[in-house]
Amino acid sequence: MAEATLARRRPSRRPAWAGFAFSSPWIIGLVVFMAGPILVSLYYSFTEFNLFQSPRWVGLKNYATLLEDPKFLGSVFNTAYLAIIGVPLGLAFALLVALALNFPVRGQPLYRAIVYLPAIVPVVTASYLWRWVFNAQYGYLNQVLGRVGLPQPNWLADPLWTKPAVLIIIWWGIGATAVIYLAALKQVPQQLYEAAAVDGANGWQRFWYVTWPALTPVTLFQLIMGVIAALQIFAPTYLLTQSRGNGANGGPGDSLLTYTMHLFHNAFVFLKMGQAAAMAWILFLVIGLLTLLILLTSRRWVHYGSE
């Protein structure tokens, strides 16, 4: 009798096996198409491999060679420049746009749609459009600058102006970030603003002590995603520096040679798959460490509703 009772209480393993069976296609796909290639790329990063010959083990040579490569160091600087300047200012611009869209004015839905529209334009289309806008001879931007008496820089041929041109393209697509900020603004209780007004808080104080703390969780998410995207930027710089029949060359003085573009050149132009794999793993570790650092420091400035 006791054995029969224990048998009835013993949990069945059929539901667990059924779950594994239903998820097995996804697990197999993950192992075959993601986990497997990732581990293979780690092996390739310690080899000399050009796709036509068998990989030859060279140890840490690829990593040491990269540290001595001026183009590698230049690509690190260019990418860091775009990330350090582009991400914080992009978040600031998006927040200002969201604050402006949060005011109850006539035609508000139309303004929101206009702001968000550039974010859904394909990056290839937007990059070619901006390439025409930045043209030094007949570009629309220089025509406007000339009419108001301002200098007309050679945006895509002068190393001093190539990075600002890319930053403009990046900031052009802040509509998605602004919409997320706008959604967060809608969640701030109006009672907090009313209480702050009763206490005599001015507009800046209401923003700093009421609005900003409520936006810090969203800012944390946007900061992490922005850093990851900036460190992997490829399409705008590649398309802006692309010349007819010669591919992309990194721009004047390699001023737009970003990390991922240099990785692409090593892999598919020079067929240095070992160095490309090493660069990919360096980028992976840098993104992971920066994400961890942001999460650890977020405890000091991110405020949640329950705190």
Model-flagged regions — what are they?
Residues 1-14:
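Short, Lys/Arg-rich, polar N-terminal cytosolic tail immediately upstream
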Residues 15-307:
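A structural signal for multi-pass alpha-helical bundles of membrane permease subunits
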